[in-house]
Amino acid sequence: MAPVIKQQDDLLLNLYIQPKASRDQIVGVHGEELKIAITAPPVDGKANAHLIKYLSKAFKVPKGDINILKGEQGRHKQVKVISPRVIPENISSQL
């Protein structure tokens, strides 16, 4: 499966999350997933909340337009971005 899939106006992202990183960044392709490093620890949903906030800024959409479809409790996640206004360059290259 591809790391980034376009579904009409939406994007489906297959992600591998690296929590407790030194900074927030989209690292690149990691196997068949897109690796994203975030600074938040994987405790009490903090990493998921931080990931949603980071992705909403990257795609310039409200936080409500970022949905974690699979992987709430793990590092491997499937996330849907509804009608992104901007697609970061390192993600658009995967389309």
UniProtKB/Swiss-Prot annotation:
Protein name: UPF0235 protein Swoo_1329
Coiled coil feature spans: none
One of the Pfam families matching this protein, by short name: DUF167
Entries under PANTHER family matching the protein: UPF0235 PROTEIN C15ORF40
Any GO CC annotation of this UniProt entry: cytoplasm
Transmembrane intervals: none
Domain of life assignment: Bacteria
Disulphide bridges: none
Organism: Shewanella woodyi (strain ATCC 51908 / MS32)
Family under the similarity heading: Belongs to the UPF0235 family.
